[in-house]
Amino acid sequence: MKKIILLLLLAINVKSFAQKFEGLASTPPMGWNSWNTFQTNISEELVKGIADSMVSSGMKDVGYTYLVLDDGWMAMERDATTGDLIPDPKKFPHGMKALIDYVHSKGLKFGLYNCAGTKTCAGYPGTRGYEYQDARFYASLGIDYLKFDWCYTDSLNAQEAYGTMSKALFTAKQPIIFSLCEWGSHQPWLWAAKDGQLWRSTGDIGICYQGDTVIGGGWRPNCVMKCVDLNEPLRKYAGPNHWNDPDMLEVGNGMSEAEDRTHFSLWCMMASPLIAGNDIRKMTAVTKAILTNKDAIAINQDVLGVQGWRYASKDSVETWFKPLNNGDWAVCFVNRTRQPQKINFNWKKENVNDELSSKQLNAATATYKIMDVWTKKNLSTTAKAFSATVQPHDVVMLQLIKQ
């Protein structure tokens, strides 16, 4: 009898800790977010235009599903009677529900933003003290994604704050992807898998490849390669339904074509969420080609869900590997220098053994066809050593297809 009671108590306890919807992010989420390009300068017209462009550009067809409206969508004060958040009536004259219905009619999903503190980062009403009320409000709108930031939190405990919001969303019974955006300050990779589907592993990204950049107000963003360096060691914490997030994409926002290609390639290698942040209504053919490269995206979305890693680094040229579900491998050679760099990689002399996934690449016992992910060229097999020149701040990204 005591054993039965103990089992019942354990079952109740486990159920009480179930506080996120499973299966919403079996592969890294893909979509678009308004912040990088528009900050709080958002509107109903903009959102509809972005939704239309996600469809017409082919982004939806290759997997970009979530349209996320970041900071600035709400009025500066809550409803004086109900305490509810109020979508800004000037920015959204037909209301938020009608706009969400429009986005859903395009076959897309919709996300909103708020903050764990008393205010959002831009000074709009935060969620602190309103977690369950806001969760019910989001459920009534039918949103699919919530980005939850970390401004104006004072001495708030991060684990408790995000845990409370996660429980509130779960209680509201609307399946919503919960994106924890506390910048990696409190090591969310150690505790956030029970709360949400992705967590920021870095501070905010900027439009810069590497180095130290200062933006207005003295803000120092993380350049692309700093985000990479911070995120890469955390691979063991990532996997289906719980992803490391080194922040949104800056592809198309001002870096060079080579730097954009490197940025996208490494986000794909690291199984990072692919959340575009450019004005896709006006993107160039080059930007579109990078963001919609089906082979790179397939590497990112591989169902094995293993984050790739930096296998070797010599003279600022890095070699990355990522095991894939069907026995194939993704390989990326990254040139962090400002000069072209020649590489020569003898597959048979390298025994790539990934303890995390228990996958092994041994070209001495198996042969792989080599396909260049960006040029789409077939490049012989691993029976021969691989030679190439990697251009400055660029990559050579390969898929090894097992024979």
Please report, for each region that a protein language model flagged, where it lies by residue.
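Bacterial Sec-dependent N-terminal signal peptides
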Residues: 1-20
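N-terminal module-boundary/linker segments of secreted carbohydrate-active enzymes
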Residues: 19-44, 48, 53
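Structural recognition of the beta-strand scaffold that forms the well-ordered cores
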Residues: 24, 28-34, 63-70, 109-114, ...
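Active-site beta-loop-alpha junctions enriched in small/polar residues
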Residues: 35-37, 72, 115-119, 151-153, ...
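Aromatic-lined carbohydrate-binding/catalytic grooves of carbohydrate-active enzymes
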Residues: 50, 54-155
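Glycan-recognition surfaces
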Residues: 130, 177-279, 300
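Carbohydrate-binding surface patches
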Residues: 267-270, 275-277, 313-358, 393
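C-terminal beta-strand-rich structural cap/linker in extracellular carbohydrate-active enzymes
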Residues: 381-403
